[in-house]
Amino acid sequence: MEAALVRGDPVPLHEQIRSQRRAALAGLVLGLLGLCGAAVWAVLEPSPDWRHESVVVGATSGAMYAVAHDPDRLVPVADLPAARLVLAALRTDRSGAATATVVPDETLSTAPRTPAAAVPGAVAVTPESTIRASWAVCDSVDPEGGLVGTTVIGDAAPRPPVDAADAVLLAGPGDTTWLVTGGVRHRVDDGDGAVRAVFRLAGRLPRAATGALVSVLPEGPPLATPVVPDRGDPAPPGLPGRVGDVLAAGVGDGQQYFAVLDGGLQEVPRAVADLLVVASVARELRPVGADVLGAATFVDTLPVAGWPEGPIRVVEPDQEPVTCWTWDPDRPEGGVWFGRELPLDAGASPVTLAQADGTGQKVDAVAVGVGGAVRATGPGRAAGVGPLWLVSAVGVGYGVADGPTAEALGVVTGAVQPAPEAALRLLPSGRPFDLADAGRAVDATPG
């Protein structure tokens, strides 16, 4: 039977069977010796001496301490960033590179302790990391335009630009209505029927928008029918019609439009031309040739710079329910994007904040990956001079007081990416990190 089981042959070969028995016995003995050796090593191996470490954590309690010397003592800290600041305050070398060593709690039971360091805790902060310089602030709505939530995204996924003719209509705080097109927001005069007709806004219900989104969108001029001084008076010499009329001249395959003013002509966008025609005496465009334009005086009286240049198409909430302000270093003022879903990388999952209020004005979720250090920037601010922030993986922003504090935390300042301060200030904020706090002791750690 043994031969059949071992060799697959019912005919026994006694010497071969004995060899196999010896090999099995030797393997068993070696295995037992290995187990015994491991047990002996576990008993005899000395536990790490906390005095020789920089930061220690109790194996059972999870309590963390920075190790101070002269004399040897333990300084209770909230987490590793706080420990690094304490080590820097103690002028310990390589504080920014310090990591925690796990030691048995019983080895710490008789160790001298100080009061806790006056450094706040910071959950899920990784000072060595940074966040890719691509940010977005997004509002999401339901098919009827009702607000669903607001999300701040760091390391936003690239998305194709929206069509220049596409626009969204927003209902902002304070009963304001905004037309967002061409990367900017324009306030709409709800009582100006001509504006609503020219931009085909009649009957369209604006989608709800938070102050967080509206505040970061670049603002263009308000959309209201321009007031033309002396409308209806005779046009200046050499110009047809009356003040307030609109002239049209063919240029290549397109047309240019000119408002007749008391001082001469002003070129205007098509939308402004349409508004002026509605309000003019002639009620129609007056075609002119190059000879009239060549002899005319041109002025810049009407405040129409920055108006939409061409026809627009308002995108409905059920088509593209997400509206975002987007930012990257090449566009310091930011831009506008809208689509069917948030601009997230595949697999990314936003963290829902405790302050989330859904249809309210607060930020509801944040997606910044593992978080990290960033340098705040904004329009008009030179690169690399803004304040440092630490953004946690759960979406909380912490200020960093100065360069020595950043170095103590382990921030690699040369690798830190810029981030828009406008977006950072929308995040829930924690108490700033400051190396000066690490030298003070308190009975209760500040929150």
Can you name each region flagged by the protein language model?
Residues 1-447:
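Short, surface-exposed polybasic-aromatic patches that bind anionic ligands, especially phosphate groups
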